[in-house]
């Protein structure tokens, strides 16, 4: 058998593995169920791709994101590794053809969304698939106590029952200890077998700034640290505004969010990857699956609601091992927003049922109907028609997803599809009477295999190049061919979609597991609380603090985060700093305390050290000293 290293060299042209990769691969090759926790950019996909290539058969990769699947398949095919993907952008005919190819062709990887596991078509082909490994990407999605629970992941357990002798490799970049255990349990590991790479990023400097004028600080950071940058914002509107403000400072910047067309997103992403654009200002729709090693700064203009998201997003900086910076900006309003989030993210059951009822009315779905159907969903029109708050609707939809009632895909991209629906004899006659449509028809027949048997994906831009016509002319002719009954034509679609997983129920009888719902809310409150502490009262090394959240107690002070640098400057150990800080907080009453009185209470501590801590707390706006010399806690 070819060694793992030789396989890596042959296809990836690397001479060595990254930390933990080889151990994980060997575990998989030994047939062991394995959980791998590797940081963003740590090479998770290599851990299942290498062993799958070394063994006979097909690796089944379960992944939640269509864009990631497409990227992985494209990258594998570029390496001459045959791979396929089945996702919601395919027609029934295309899914059937893909699964048939997986059975009869010499393919090594089949990427599948978890929703597809329970379809009759997949179940029909499953016994014929020679599966050598089940790889579960974004494995934290299986835990309802995690930050991104997706119910379809629970169906993977049924797959394990069907394939009891096939090992599973679960990979994730961020899972706290309780979620790690949940992954092991839900995926029915035969033995607990977990590989954890340290959550420490020794080249990444974390900093937090409480500041009123975020935009000025943002520009200051970009001017201070040259190179490629990502700026994360919470709202689509803000991404455009901030990109424009950055551009005014003669810094190349663009914006990116899920509301843009697929073509626009691809163009903006490529311009940033090629360094044509220096700064990309984006929502969290950006970044998944993008491997750009030379990002020097990741700046959060808004505070994320949990450490998992922050760690993943910040971790996109400095993948080349050189010094990089993760900067988080916040103000008093951000703190209030975070504190209010648990009640917003977990709406009252009455409100959830109201949104469900309104959704059924909007989509015109009668009681007892709808299971398995996909519906176009314009959320802006919906909230306007039913006078609902858009944040309530988004959060109610998330709850309905987690309860297994529906799925909401905001980033849907369905390519155009076409199929000839007349016989070849009639087609020949038609060509004679409609010569103006001949070029497009011949292009379809020559370019798209299977187009006479059923709907297949077509690419209108490709047709424009081959026929030397404009995109408008091609679309018009395709519509004309449909009107004349020659083809069935489904234009490209980027409208968000709702998929009902069950028949519509009367709203008053809609089942929501209240005990689990409350427990998920409590878990979320703990995540927000940890994030708030990171912002407002973290006096230990930030790298150490982040790592402790994920259960990694081995990390030492990084010496490069804002907290470490500040404590270095005041020549205090962490223990000394915390001791002085504690006395200060305990001494200051609600009415405040004169500075002289505070220094008396710090008797026995060197005055310069005491003042250094006071000055630090003042600069961090945790305390304030008024004109009378009275110290108060802010």
Question: Which stretches of residues belong to each language-model region?
Answer:
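Helicase motor core with emphasis on the C-terminal RecA-like subdomain
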Residues: 2-11, 15-19, 23-45, 52-55, ...
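C-terminal accessory region of SF2 helicases/translocases
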Residues: 294-295, 299, 303-312, 318-627
């Amino acid at each position: 058998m070819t060694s793992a290293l030789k396989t890596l060299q042959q296809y990836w042209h690397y001479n060595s593995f990254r930390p933990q990769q080889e151990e994980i691969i060997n575990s998989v090759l030994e047939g062991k169920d394995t959980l791998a926790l590797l940081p963003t950019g740590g090479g998770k996909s290599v851990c299942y791709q290498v062993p799958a290539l070394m063994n006979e058969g097909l690796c089944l990769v379960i992944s939640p994101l269509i864009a990631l699947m497409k990227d992985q398949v494209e990258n594998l095919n570029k390496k001459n590794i045959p791979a396929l993907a089945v996702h919601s952008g395919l027609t029934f005919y295309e899914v059937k053809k893909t699964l048939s190819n997986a059975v009869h062709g010499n393919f090594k990887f089949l990427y599948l969304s978890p929703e597809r596991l329970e379809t009759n078509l997949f179940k029909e082909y499953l016994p014929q698939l020679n599966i050598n490994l089940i790889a579960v990407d974004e494995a934290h999605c299986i835990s309802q106590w995690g930050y991104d629970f997706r119910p379809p992941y629970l169906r993977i357990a049924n797959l394990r029952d069907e394939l009891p002798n096939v090992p599973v490799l679960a990979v994730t970049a961020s899972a706290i200890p309780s979620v790690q255990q949940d992954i092991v349990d839900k995926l029915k590991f035969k033995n607990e077998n977990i590989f954890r790479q340290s959550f420490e990023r020794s080249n990444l400097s974390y900093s937090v700034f409480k500041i009123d004028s975020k935009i000025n600080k943002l520009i200051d950071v970009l001017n201070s640290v040259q190179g490629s940058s990502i700026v994360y914002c919470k709202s689509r509107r803000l991404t455009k505004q901030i990109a424009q403000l950055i551009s005014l400072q003669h810094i190349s910047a663009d914006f990116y969010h899920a509301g843009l067309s697929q073509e626009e997103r691809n163009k903006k992403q490529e311009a940033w990857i090629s360094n044509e654009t220096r700064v990309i200002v984006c929502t969290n729709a950006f970044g998944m699956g993008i491997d750009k090693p030379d990002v020097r700064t990741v700046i959060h203009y808004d505070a994320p609601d949990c450490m998992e998201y922050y760690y993943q997003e910040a971790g996109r900086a400095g993948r080349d091992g050189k010094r990089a910076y993760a900067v988080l900006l916040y103000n008093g309003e951000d703190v209030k927003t975070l504190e209010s989030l648990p009640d917003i993210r977990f709406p009252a059951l009455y409100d959830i049922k109201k949104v469900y009822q309104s959704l059924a009315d909007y989509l015109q779905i009668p009681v007892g109907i709808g299971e398995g159907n996909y519906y176009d969903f314009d959320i802006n029109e919906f909230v306007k028609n039913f006078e609902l708050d858009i944040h309530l609707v988004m959060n109610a939809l998330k709850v309905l997803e987690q309860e297994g009632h529906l799925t909401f895909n905001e980033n849907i991209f369905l390519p155009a599809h076409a199929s000839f629906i007349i016989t070849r004899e009639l087609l020949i006659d038609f060509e004679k009477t409609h010569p103006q449509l001949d070029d497009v028809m011949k292009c379809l027949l020559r370019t798209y295999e299977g187009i006479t048997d059923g709907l297949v994906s077509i690419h209108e831009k490709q047709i424009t190049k081959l026929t030397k016509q404009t995109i408008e002319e091609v679309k018009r002719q395709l519509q004309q061919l449909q009107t004349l009954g020659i083809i069935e034509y489904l234009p490209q679609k980027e409208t968000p979609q709702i998929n009902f997983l069950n028949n519509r129920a009367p709203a008053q009888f809609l089942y929501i597991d209240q005990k689990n719902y409350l427990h998920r809310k409590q878990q979320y409150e703990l995540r927000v609380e940890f994030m708030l502490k990171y912002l407002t009262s973290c006096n230990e090394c930030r790298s150490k603090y982040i790592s402790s959240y994920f259960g990694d107690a081995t990390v030492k002070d990084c010496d490069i985060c804002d907290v470490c640098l500040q404590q270095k400057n005041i020549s205090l150990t962490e223990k000394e700093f915390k001791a002085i800080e504690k006395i200060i907080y305990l001494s200051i009453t609600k009415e405040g305390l004169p500075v002289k009185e505070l220094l008396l209470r710090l008797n026995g501590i060197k005055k310069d050290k005491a003042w250094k801590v006071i000055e630090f707390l003042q600069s961090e706006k945790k305390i304030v000293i008024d004109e009378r010399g009275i110290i108060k806690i802010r």
